[in-house]
Amino acid sequence: MAQPKRRWSKQRTHKHRANWKLEIPNLTECPQCHEMKLPHRVCPNCGYYRNRKVVNQD
């Protein structure tokens, strides 16, 4: 595999990493309890997924 001829400077590294951004998670509203949740996952608040009780919340 090819190897770099010279080491990247700190400035070049920081400029390169300046474009690394975190993405905001996509949230949807739970149809049962109307809390925000991640899509395609069980609601952590009420335990429902696709209108079925999947997890018992005690």
From Swiss-Prot:
GO terms for cellular component: large ribosomal subunit. It comes from the Bacteria. Keywords: Ribonucleoprotein, Ribosomal protein. Belongs to the bacterial ribosomal protein bL32 family. HAMAP family: Ribosomal_bL32. It comes from Caldicellulosiruptor bescii (strain ATCC BAA-1888 / DSM 6725 / KCTC 15123 / Z-1320). Pfam families: Ribosomal_L32p. One of its GO terms (biological process) is translation. This is Large ribosomal subunit protein bL32. InterPro entries: Ribosomal_bL32 (IPR002677), Ribosomal_bL32_bact (IPR044957), Ribosomal_zn-bd (IPR011332). One of its GO terms (molecular function) is structural constituent of ribosome.
